[in-house]
Amino acid sequence: MMTKVLGMAPVLGPRPPQEQVGPLMVKVEEKEEKGKYLPSLEMFRQRFRQFGYHDTPGPREALSQLRVLCCEWLRPEIHTKEQILELLVLEQFLTILPQELQAWVQEHCPESAEEAVTLLEDLERELDEPGHQVSTPPNEQKPVWEKISSSGTAKESPSSVQPQPLETSHKYESWGPLYIQESGEEQAFAQDPRKVRDCRLSTQHEESADEQKASEAEGLKGDIISVIIANKPEARLERQCVNLXXEKGTKPPLQESGSKKGRESVPTKPTPGERRYICAECGKAFSNSSNLTKHRRTHTGEKPYVCTKCGKAFSHSSNLTLHYRTHLVDRPYDCKCGKAFGQSSDLLKHQRMHTEEAPYQCKDCGKAFSGKGSLIRHYRIHTGEKPYQCNECGKSFSQHAGLSSHQRLHTGEKPYKCKECGKAFNHSSNFNKHHRIHTGEKPYWCHHCGKTFCSKSNLSKHQRVHTGEGEAP
């Protein structure tokens, strides 16, 4: 009937965009009179995500229905792979947003994740402007749905919509075909679903509903501002620094910035490699908390890692792992003199005995050492440094091993026990000397004549015969 009044053909088929202004208005009004609206991508997405297994009689039917719902949402027949991928990325991006930001972004109907990011960045820039207020300024541009709902056609009820002259409906020309036939609705919707949604809003909402939405949007905007400020990188860093200061028992400094006074200062973002974890005992700084924890054990003497074989304790797990290899039978690193080692570093140190290689030299006396640790321990002879002190008697030692051995005099501990005869020792060196009685091992080799000895002291006595200092034993 309506097509006859307007002089249209009774059957409407696809036409070029410039010829579809008339049927566009007619079909929109007919749909509104019936109370039917085009489905949205969001509705199809929700139908796919909320589909339940119990809605179908069996697993095959459930899988088939899921395929149908997925195709209704992603539209693989008209969307490219890149467009489908972008829809999935957009969905996940909206999912990880805070609830307040989700609602705000969805109101703006972004068609891609990049568009959603642009919306959020624009909002952040708006919040960073000086003198920003939570309430909407008078000259602020209204949201899209507010603009449409404030038009004259939106104030009329759907039943009162009348056909408009062609010259007043040019604003719909750029939207493309919306309603052509019943079978063409989905194709028209796929071209621009957001504008169909805007058209639906423009003919459905009344003025009272618009005012209520504007009030809700105002409250939502305040929540959005709080979420954005709380989730800014500098705010997260500020919370971390506050937690770090709380561990030290200090309060972070306060500063005045603009119109906000008493607010905690926001520190700058730490640069890579910055050492923010400081030892309260000596002031040494570290780039991460785990290294600081390990360092603190040098002050407390804590040794939480204990060997289950001999009871020896270590401050680091890596040292315990290296030590535990000494109890294993497997010693894959062999020296040509017959001695075997569990670690390649120990073999290298041992081989320096044969080559007389001593790359680490003392600057004070010129004495050379095969290991860097030996040089450090030797250097304390010149400085007189004895950093390790016994808590029982106050005696100090230049080496930690000396303190550990001394403390066993107070405790009576003898952790080194011989499996052959059961004899126990409080020093590993004494245990090693004793153990060679059972094994017949002679690890100390004279590089002049090739003779071997079971102890270093016997080798020293023997070498005097080559240097002319005394007779060989």
Swiss-Prot record:
One biological process term from GO is: cell differentiation
Site of the Glycyl lysine isopeptide (Lys-Gly) (interchain with G-Cter in SUMO2) crosslink?
K27, K221, K232, K349
- The coiled-coil regions, if any, are none
- List the CDD domains: SCAN (cd07936)
- Specify where the region named Disordered lies, as residue ranges: 127-167, 247-272
Q: Where are the zinc fingers (C2H2-type)?
A: 277-299, 305-327, 333-354, 360-382, 388-410, 416-438, 444-466
Which cell locations does it reside in? Answer: Nucleus
Q: Where is the SCAN box domain?
A: 45-127
Q: Does the keyword Phosphoprotein apply?
A: no
CC terms in the record's Gene Ontology section: nucleus
Where is there biased composition of kind Basic and acidic residues?
A: 258-272
Which PROSITE patterns does the UniProt entry name for this protein?
A: SCAN_BOX (PS50804), ZINC_FINGER_C2H2_1 (PS00028), ZINC_FINGER_C2H2_2 (PS50157)
Q: Which UniProt keywords apply?
A: Activator, Differentiation, DNA-binding, Isopeptide bond, Meiosis, Metal-binding, Nucleus, Repeat, Spermatogenesis, Transcription, Transcription regulation, Ubl conjugation, Zinc, Zinc-finger
State the Gene Ontology terms under molecular function: DNA-binding transcription factor activity, RNA polymerase II-specific; RNA polymerase II cis-regulatory region sequence-specific DNA binding; zinc ion binding
Q: Which Gene3D superfamilies match?
A: Classic Zinc Finger, DNA breaking-rejoining enzymes
Q: Where is the composition biased (Polar residues)?
A: 148-167
- Known PANTHER family for this protein? ZINC FINGER AND SCAN DOMAIN-CONTAINING, ZINC FINGER PROTEIN 174
* Family stated for the protein in its record: Belongs to the krueppel C2H2-type zinc-finger protein family.
Known role: Strong transcriptional activator. Plays an important role in spermatogenesis; essential for the progression of meiotic prophase I in spermatocytes.
Name the chain's protein: Zinc finger and SCAN domain-containing protein 21
- What organism does this protein naturally occur in? Pongo pygmaeus
- Upper classification of the organism: Eukaryota, Metazoa, Chordata, Craniata, Vertebrata
